[in-house]
């Protein structure tokens, strides 16, 4: 029996898991897929931590983001190894927030009932820190697995040129920054279905990588350093004695530079034992 697909939706900065796009997504895939629409924390490191925890537990088959949620999805997709649809991605959240310093309210209900929040310099600096490294794990393998969807009437985010510096598939829809329910079902959902069809995730979720020096490895698990709680990667050599190795997750997935050339330290590959 085929396992039910799981979709993880990441909402925009002012939104929640009950925003219009989230509700439309749940309605569109009712009976067809398991849809997760969590409330994301205000602070970006907390949001990313929660998303990773959900990915560890629920093992989604695709990430779907809108605005700030797309900012998160782009960074997480190559690390967890699943395709992503980035709706109106906002890759410069610090600029967006700097013009809005002060007290605000979320535009859709939050499950904890807390609707008020404040934008301040510390929050802006957190986003700036992430923005400086947001494409560090972007790789050749993922170039056609992360799709962008851009509203032709979007007045807030204009990042299609930046998106196309890293990815190949750009789509458009006749709408603004936040799609209506009808627009979401008409334009987002067919692309989500196509991503699920074109890039199915292996049931065992085994992934293979090639080091830039040529050796190949199997990714075994994501783990935590018991002292620092830093994310680590456990991987096994597919040569020699098939030894197991551990290194910080960032050092495994990041892009490095050698002799003026930039490339992934470990490049994901299609490979069968």
Regions found by a protein language model. Name each.
Residues 64-73:
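Gly/Ala-rich beta-loop-alpha elbow adjacent to hydrolase catalytic centers
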Residues 9-13, 64, 149-151:
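Short hydrophobic segments within beta-strands
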Residues 83-198:
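The alpha/beta-hydrolase serine catalytic core
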Residues 197-273:
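Mixed-charge, low-complexity intrinsically disordered regions
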Residues 2-57, 177, 201-202:
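Active-site catalytic motif of lipid deacylating hydrolases and related acyltransferases
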Residues 75, 79:
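Active-site signature of alpha/beta-hydrolase-fold catalytic machinery across serine-
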Residues 61-64, 83-85:
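Residue in the alpha/beta-hydrolase core beta-strand immediately N-terminal to the catalytic nucleophile
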Residues 58, 80:
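Active-site charged/polar residues at nucleotide-handling catalytic sites that mediate phosphoryl
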């Amino acid at each position: 029996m085929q396992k039910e697909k799981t979709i993880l939706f990441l909402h925009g900065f002012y939104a929640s898991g009950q925003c219009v796009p989230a509700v439309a997504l749940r309605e569109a895939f009712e009976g067809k897929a398991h849809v997760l629409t969590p409330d994301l924390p205000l602070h970006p490191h907390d949001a990313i931590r929660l998303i990773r925890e959900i990915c560890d537990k629920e093992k989604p088959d695709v990430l779907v983001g809108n605005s700030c949620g797309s900012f998160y999805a782009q960074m997480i997709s190559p690390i967890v190894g699943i395709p992503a649809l980035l709706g109106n991605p906002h890759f410069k959240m610090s600029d967006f927030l700097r013009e809005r310093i002060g007290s605000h309210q979320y535009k859709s209900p939050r499950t904890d009932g807390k609707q008020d929040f404040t934008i301040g310099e510390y929050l802006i600096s957190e986003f700036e820190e992430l923005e400086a490294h947001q494409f560090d794990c972007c790789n050749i393998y993922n170039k056609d697995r992360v799709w962008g969807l851009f509203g032709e009437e979007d007045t807030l985010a204009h990042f299609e040129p930046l998106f196309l510096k890293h990815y190949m598939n750009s789509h458009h829809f006749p709408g603004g920054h936040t799609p209506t329910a009808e627009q979401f079902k008409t334009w987002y959902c067919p692309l989500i279905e196509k991503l699920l069809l074109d890039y199915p995730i292996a049931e065992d979720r085994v992934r293979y990588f090639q080091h830039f020096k040529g050796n190949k490895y199997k990714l075994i698990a994501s783990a935590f350093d018991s002292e620092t709680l830093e994310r680590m990667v456990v991987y096994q050599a597919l040569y020699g004695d098939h030894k197991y190795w551990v290194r910080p997750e960032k050092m495994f997935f990041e892009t490095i530079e050698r002799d003026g050339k930039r490339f992934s330290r470990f490049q994901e590959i299609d490979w069968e034992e």
